[in-house]
Amino acid sequence: MAELLAIKWDDNRDKLILLDQTILPNKIEYIEYDTAEGVYDSIKDMIVRGAPAIGVTAAYGLYFAAKVAPEDKFEGFFKYLKEKSAYLDSSRPTAVNLSWALKVMESKALENKDKDVKEIKSILREEAKRIHEEDIEICKTIGENLITLLKDGVGILTHCNAGQLATSKYGTATSPMYLAKEKGWNFKVYSDETRPRLQGSTLTALELYEAGIDVTTITDNMAAMVMSQGKIDAVIVGCDRIAANGDTANKIGTMGVSILAKYFGIPMYIAAPTPSIDINTKTGEDIPIEERNSEEVTSRFGVWTAPKGVKVYNPGFDVTPHENITAIVTEKGIVYPPFKENLKKLFEK
Protein backbone atom coordinates (compact mmCIF):
# COMPACT_ATOMS: atom_id res chain seq x y z
CA MET A 1 0.00 0.00 0.00
CA ALA A 2 1.15 3.54 -0.76
CA GLU A 3 2.70 5.70 1.96
CA LEU A 4 0.90 9.02 2.17
CA LEU A 5 3.15 11.93 3.14
CA ALA A 6 1.67 15.36 3.79
CA ILE A 7 4.92 17.23 3.08
CA LYS A 8 7.72 16.64 0.62
CA TRP A 9 10.72 18.83 -0.20
CA ASP A 10 12.29 18.85 -3.65
CA ASP A 11 15.88 19.86 -2.94
CA ASN A 12 16.89 20.08 -6.58
CA ARG A 13 14.05 22.37 -7.64
CA ASP A 14 13.68 24.26 -4.35
CA LYS A 15 9.98 23.49 -4.12
CA LEU A 16 7.62 22.47 -1.34
CA ILE A 17 5.20 19.72 -2.33
CA LEU A 18 2.00 19.31 -0.31
CA LEU A 19 -0.65 16.63 -0.44
CA ASP A 20 -4.01 18.30 -1.10
CA GLN A 21 -5.97 17.07 1.90
CA THR A 22 -9.18 18.84 0.89
CA ILE A 23 -9.93 16.22 -1.78
CA LEU A 24 -9.02 13.09 0.18
CA PRO A 25 -9.95 10.24 0.11
CA ASN A 26 -11.36 10.56 -3.41
CA LYS A 27 -8.19 11.86 -5.06
CA ILE A 28 -4.51 11.81 -4.19
CA GLU A 29 -2.89 14.90 -5.68
CA TYR A 30 0.17 16.94 -4.74
CA ILE A 31 0.56 20.70 -5.23
CA GLU A 32 3.90 22.49 -5.59
CA TYR A 33 4.72 25.77 -3.83
CA ASP A 34 7.59 28.23 -4.04
CA THR A 35 6.12 31.47 -2.64
CA ALA A 36 5.12 32.70 0.81
CA GLU A 37 1.72 33.69 -0.57
CA GLY A 38 1.08 30.19 -1.87
CA VAL A 39 2.10 28.71 1.47
CA TYR A 40 -0.24 31.11 3.30
CA ASP A 41 -3.15 29.95 1.14
CA SER A 42 -2.24 26.28 1.64
CA ILE A 43 -2.49 26.71 5.43
CA LYS A 44 -5.57 28.96 5.41
CA ASP A 45 -7.47 26.69 3.00
CA MET A 46 -6.37 23.54 4.84
CA ILE A 47 -4.51 22.00 1.92
CA VAL A 48 -2.11 21.22 4.75
CA ARG A 49 -3.41 20.83 8.30
CA GLY A 50 -2.34 19.54 11.67
CA ALA A 51 -0.22 21.70 13.96
CA PRO A 52 3.19 20.06 13.31
CA ALA A 53 2.68 20.00 9.53
CA ILE A 54 1.55 23.63 9.56
CA GLY A 55 4.71 24.61 11.44
CA VAL A 56 6.99 22.84 8.97
CA THR A 57 5.11 24.33 6.02
CA ALA A 58 5.33 27.84 7.48
CA ALA A 59 9.10 27.48 7.92
CA TYR A 60 9.46 26.76 4.21
CA GLY A 61 7.08 29.65 3.49
CA LEU A 62 9.30 32.09 5.37
CA TYR A 63 12.32 30.78 3.49
CA PHE A 64 10.49 31.48 0.22
CA ALA A 65 9.83 35.03 1.47
CA ALA A 66 13.49 35.47 2.39
CA LYS A 67 14.59 34.14 -0.97
CA VAL A 68 12.94 37.04 -2.84
CA ALA A 69 13.54 39.74 -0.20
CA PRO A 70 14.48 42.97 -2.02
CA GLU A 71 16.83 44.19 0.72
CA ASP A 72 20.57 43.51 0.72
CA LYS A 73 21.29 45.09 4.13
CA PHE A 74 20.39 43.07 7.22
CA GLU A 75 18.20 45.72 8.89
CA GLY A 76 15.93 46.04 5.87
CA PHE A 77 16.01 42.31 5.21
CA PHE A 78 15.03 41.43 8.77
CA LYS A 79 12.21 43.98 8.80
CA TYR A 80 10.86 42.42 5.60
CA LEU A 81 11.24 38.94 7.12
CA LYS A 82 9.32 39.96 10.26
CA GLU A 83 6.49 41.35 8.14
CA LYS A 84 6.23 38.13 6.14
CA SER A 85 6.41 36.11 9.34
CA ALA A 86 3.45 38.02 10.81
CA TYR A 87 1.58 37.50 7.54
CA LEU A 88 2.12 33.73 7.63
CA ASP A 89 1.31 33.60 11.34
CA SER A 90 -2.14 35.06 10.65
CA SER A 91 -3.14 32.13 8.44
CA ARG A 92 -4.38 29.98 11.37
CA PRO A 93 -4.22 31.43 14.91
CA THR A 94 -4.78 28.39 17.14
CA ALA A 95 -1.86 26.11 16.20
CA VAL A 96 1.12 27.24 18.29
CA ASN A 97 3.56 25.28 16.09
CA LEU A 98 2.95 27.87 13.40
CA SER A 99 4.26 30.80 15.44
CA TRP A 100 6.94 28.56 16.99
CA ALA A 101 8.44 27.60 13.62
CA LEU A 102 8.37 31.20 12.41
CA LYS A 103 10.12 32.41 15.57
CA VAL A 104 12.79 29.73 15.13
CA MET A 105 13.39 30.97 11.59
CA GLU A 106 13.53 34.61 12.74
CA SER A 107 16.00 33.71 15.50
CA LYS A 108 18.21 31.87 13.04
CA ALA A 109 18.36 34.97 10.85
CA LEU A 110 19.16 37.16 13.86
CA GLU A 111 21.94 34.81 15.00
CA ASN A 112 23.63 35.34 11.64
CA LYS A 113 23.05 39.08 11.26
CA ASP A 114 26.76 39.75 10.72
CA LYS A 115 26.80 37.57 7.62
CA ASP A 116 25.95 38.50 4.07
CA VAL A 117 22.19 38.50 3.38
CA LYS A 118 22.68 36.05 0.53
CA GLU A 119 24.33 33.63 2.95
CA ILE A 120 21.53 34.14 5.50
CA LYS A 121 19.01 33.10 2.86
CA SER A 122 20.87 29.81 2.39
CA ILE A 123 21.02 29.34 6.16
CA LEU A 124 17.24 29.80 6.40
CA ARG A 125 16.77 27.18 3.68
CA GLU A 126 18.75 24.68 5.73
CA GLU A 127 16.90 25.66 8.91
CA ALA A 128 13.52 24.94 7.32
CA LYS A 129 14.82 21.53 6.22
CA ARG A 130 16.10 20.90 9.76
CA ILE A 131 12.69 21.70 11.26
CA HIS A 132 11.16 19.26 8.77
CA GLU A 133 13.59 16.45 9.64
CA GLU A 134 13.32 17.13 13.38
CA ASP A 135 9.54 16.75 13.23
CA ILE A 136 9.96 13.21 11.86
CA GLU A 137 12.23 12.24 14.76
CA ILE A 138 9.95 13.89 17.33
CA CYS A 139 6.92 11.97 16.09
CA LYS A 140 8.72 8.63 16.16
CA THR A 141 9.93 9.24 19.71
CA ILE A 142 6.43 10.21 20.87
CA GLY A 143 5.23 6.88 19.52
CA GLU A 144 7.99 5.01 21.35
CA ASN A 145 6.99 6.71 24.61
CA LEU A 146 3.26 6.23 24.09
CA ILE A 147 3.44 2.53 23.23
CA THR A 148 4.76 1.84 26.75
CA LEU A 149 1.27 2.82 28.02
CA LEU A 150 -0.47 0.31 25.74
CA LYS A 151 -0.51 -3.46 25.33
CA ASP A 152 -1.22 -6.05 22.66
CA GLY A 153 -4.96 -6.37 22.00
CA VAL A 154 -5.71 -2.74 22.88
CA GLY A 155 -8.75 -0.88 21.55
CA ILE A 156 -7.99 2.77 20.76
CA LEU A 157 -10.30 5.70 20.04
CA THR A 158 -8.89 8.72 18.25
CA HIS A 159 -10.48 11.99 17.15
CA CYS A 160 -9.68 14.13 14.11
CA ASN A 161 -6.31 13.48 12.46
CA ALA A 162 -3.10 13.65 14.44
CA GLY A 163 -1.57 11.18 12.06
CA GLN A 164 1.07 11.07 9.40
CA LEU A 165 -1.07 13.47 7.36
CA ALA A 166 -0.86 16.06 10.17
CA THR A 167 2.92 15.83 10.53
CA SER A 168 6.02 15.14 8.47
CA LYS A 169 5.79 11.39 9.16
CA TYR A 170 4.38 8.87 11.70
CA GLY A 171 1.98 11.35 13.24
CA THR A 172 1.67 12.02 16.96
CA ALA A 173 -1.47 10.17 18.08
CA THR A 174 -0.99 7.54 15.36
CA SER A 175 2.74 7.03 15.90
CA PRO A 176 2.26 4.24 18.49
CA MET A 177 -0.22 2.60 16.10
CA TYR A 178 2.38 2.38 13.34
CA LEU A 179 4.95 1.06 15.82
CA ALA A 180 2.46 -1.49 17.20
CA LYS A 181 1.82 -2.65 13.65
CA GLU A 182 5.56 -3.15 13.18
CA LYS A 183 5.64 -5.22 16.39
CA GLY A 184 2.88 -7.47 15.08
CA TRP A 185 0.37 -6.46 17.74
CA ASN A 186 -3.29 -7.35 17.32
CA PHE A 187 -5.15 -4.11 18.05
CA LYS A 188 -8.10 -2.11 16.82
CA VAL A 189 -8.56 1.61 16.18
CA TYR A 190 -11.88 3.45 16.20
CA SER A 191 -11.74 6.76 14.34
CA ASP A 192 -14.37 9.44 15.03
CA GLU A 193 -15.42 10.92 11.70
CA THR A 194 -14.90 14.40 13.24
CA ARG A 195 -17.50 16.78 11.92
CA PRO A 196 -17.84 19.14 10.23
CA ARG A 197 -14.75 18.59 8.02
CA LEU A 198 -14.58 14.83 8.56
CA GLN A 199 -10.83 14.61 9.14
CA GLY A 200 -11.29 11.37 11.06
CA SER A 201 -13.01 9.54 8.23
CA THR A 202 -11.33 11.17 5.24
CA LEU A 203 -7.79 11.33 6.67
CA THR A 204 -7.19 9.14 9.73
CA ALA A 205 -9.21 6.19 8.43
CA LEU A 206 -7.54 6.57 5.03
CA GLU A 207 -3.94 6.58 6.25
CA LEU A 208 -4.46 3.76 8.75
CA TYR A 209 -6.34 1.66 6.20
CA GLU A 210 -3.57 2.23 3.65
CA ALA A 211 -1.06 1.09 6.28
CA GLY A 212 -2.97 -2.14 6.86
CA ILE A 213 -4.10 -1.20 10.37
CA ASP A 214 -7.48 -2.48 11.61
CA VAL A 215 -9.50 0.75 11.68
CA THR A 216 -13.24 1.33 12.06
CA THR A 217 -14.86 4.69 11.36
CA ILE A 218 -17.65 5.78 13.69
CA THR A 219 -19.82 8.89 13.81
CA ASP A 220 -18.94 11.38 16.52
CA ASN A 221 -22.12 10.65 18.48
CA MET A 222 -21.25 6.93 18.71
CA ALA A 223 -18.22 7.44 20.98
CA ALA A 224 -20.20 6.92 24.20
CA MET A 225 -21.72 3.72 22.87
CA VAL A 226 -18.43 2.05 21.87
CA MET A 227 -16.94 3.05 25.22
CA SER A 228 -19.91 1.55 27.07
CA GLN A 229 -19.46 -1.69 25.11
CA GLY A 230 -15.92 -2.09 26.45
CA LYS A 231 -14.31 -1.68 23.04
CA ILE A 232 -12.08 1.23 24.06
CA ASP A 233 -9.08 0.84 26.37
CA ALA A 234 -7.42 4.19 25.61
CA VAL A 235 -8.19 7.49 23.92
CA ILE A 236 -5.27 9.03 22.05
CA VAL A 237 -5.53 12.44 20.39
CA GLY A 238 -3.15 15.12 19.21
CA CYS A 239 -3.24 18.80 20.05
CA ASP A 240 -2.86 22.24 18.55
CA ARG A 241 -1.86 24.03 21.73
CA ILE A 242 -1.33 23.06 25.36
CA ALA A 243 -1.47 25.76 28.02
CA ALA A 244 0.91 25.88 30.98
CA ASN A 245 -1.67 24.19 33.23
CA GLY A 246 -2.29 21.32 30.80
CA ASP A 247 -5.52 22.60 29.24
CA THR A 248 -5.40 21.36 25.66
CA ALA A 249 -6.83 22.86 22.48
CA ASN A 250 -7.61 20.28 19.84
CA LYS A 251 -10.18 19.73 17.11
CA ILE A 252 -13.76 20.54 18.06
CA GLY A 253 -15.32 17.56 19.82
CA THR A 254 -12.22 16.50 21.73
CA MET A 255 -13.52 17.99 24.97
CA GLY A 256 -16.68 15.88 24.70
CA VAL A 257 -14.62 12.75 24.11
CA SER A 258 -12.55 13.54 27.22
CA ILE A 259 -15.69 13.88 29.34
CA LEU A 260 -16.92 10.50 28.12
CA ALA A 261 -13.53 8.88 28.73
CA LYS A 262 -13.47 10.21 32.29
CA TYR A 263 -16.99 8.91 32.92
CA PHE A 264 -16.11 5.41 31.68
CA GLY A 265 -12.71 5.34 33.41
CA ILE A 266 -10.73 5.23 30.17
CA PRO A 267 -7.29 6.90 30.07
CA MET A 268 -7.07 10.03 27.91
CA TYR A 269 -3.63 10.57 26.37
CA ILE A 270 -2.50 13.70 24.54
CA ALA A 271 0.28 13.11 22.01
CA ALA A 272 2.22 16.36 21.96
CA PRO A 273 5.48 17.51 20.43
CA THR A 274 7.00 20.05 22.82
CA PRO A 275 6.57 22.93 20.31
CA SER A 276 2.81 22.47 20.87
CA ILE A 277 3.23 23.29 24.57
CA ASP A 278 2.87 27.02 25.18
CA ILE A 279 4.20 27.79 28.65
CA ASN A 280 3.41 31.47 28.06
CA THR A 281 -0.32 30.69 27.80
CA LYS A 282 -1.54 30.23 31.36
CA THR A 283 -4.82 28.37 30.82
CA GLY A 284 -7.14 27.22 28.08
CA GLU A 285 -9.13 30.43 28.45
CA ASP A 286 -6.16 32.29 26.95
CA ILE A 287 -5.98 30.16 23.79
CA PRO A 288 -7.45 31.90 20.70
CA ILE A 289 -10.07 29.71 19.04
CA GLU A 290 -10.43 29.96 15.28
CA GLU A 291 -13.97 30.33 13.93
CA ARG A 292 -14.47 28.88 10.49
CA ASN A 293 -16.77 29.30 7.49
CA SER A 294 -20.45 28.57 8.14
CA GLU A 295 -20.74 26.50 4.96
CA GLU A 296 -18.56 23.81 6.53
CA VAL A 297 -21.61 23.07 8.68
CA THR A 298 -24.51 23.89 6.35
CA SER A 299 -23.38 22.06 3.20
CA ARG A 300 -21.53 18.91 2.27
CA PHE A 301 -20.44 17.65 -1.15
CA GLY A 302 -22.21 20.52 -2.86
CA VAL A 303 -25.56 19.83 -1.18
CA TRP A 304 -27.20 22.03 1.46
CA THR A 305 -27.77 20.12 4.71
CA ALA A 306 -29.32 23.04 6.62
CA PRO A 307 -31.60 25.95 5.68
CA LYS A 308 -29.80 28.67 3.74
CA GLY A 309 -29.29 31.69 5.95
CA VAL A 310 -29.57 29.80 9.24
CA LYS A 311 -27.23 31.01 11.98
CA VAL A 312 -24.11 28.89 12.42
CA TYR A 313 -21.55 28.64 15.20
CA ASN A 314 -18.46 26.87 13.89
CA PRO A 315 -15.40 27.00 16.18
CA GLY A 316 -12.59 24.87 14.79
CA PHE A 317 -11.34 23.81 18.23
CA ASP A 318 -12.37 23.29 21.81
CA VAL A 319 -10.31 23.09 24.99
CA THR A 320 -10.07 19.88 27.00
CA PRO A 321 -9.70 20.68 30.73
CA HIS A 322 -6.50 19.37 32.24
CA GLU A 323 -8.55 17.48 34.85
CA ASN A 324 -9.75 15.13 32.09
CA ILE A 325 -6.26 14.26 30.84
CA THR A 326 -4.41 11.19 32.11
CA ALA A 327 -1.02 12.06 30.60
CA ILE A 328 0.63 14.28 28.02
CA VAL A 329 3.13 12.26 26.00
CA THR A 330 6.00 14.17 24.40
CA GLU A 331 9.29 13.33 22.73
CA LYS A 332 10.98 14.29 26.02
CA GLY A 333 8.93 11.90 28.11
CA ILE A 334 5.52 11.26 29.67
CA VAL A 335 4.05 14.08 31.76
CA TYR A 336 1.50 13.30 34.47
CA PRO A 337 -0.52 15.65 36.70
CA PRO A 338 0.01 18.09 38.26
CA PHE A 339 0.65 19.48 34.78
CA LYS A 340 1.45 23.05 35.82
CA GLU A 341 4.50 21.88 37.75
CA ASN A 342 5.50 18.95 35.56
CA LEU A 343 5.21 20.70 32.19
CA LYS A 344 7.50 23.40 33.55
CA LYS A 345 10.01 20.74 34.63
CA LEU A 346 9.91 19.30 31.11
CA PHE A 347 11.48 22.47 29.75
CA GLU A 348 14.11 22.52 32.48
CA LYS A 349 15.57 19.18 31.35
UniProtKB/Swiss-Prot annotation:
The keyword Isomerase applies. GO terms for molecular function: S-methyl-5-thioribose-1-phosphate isomerase activity. The record marks 160 as: Transition state stabilizer. Pfam families: IF-2B. It comes from the Bacteria. Coiled coil: none annotated. Keywords: Carbohydrate metabolism, Isomerase. Its EC number is 5.3.1.-. The active site is at 240 (proton donor). Belongs to the EIF-2B alpha/beta/delta subunits family. DrdI subfamily. HAMAP family: Deoxyribose1P_isomerase, Salvage_MtnA. This is 5-deoxyribose 1-phosphate isomerase. The gene is drdI.
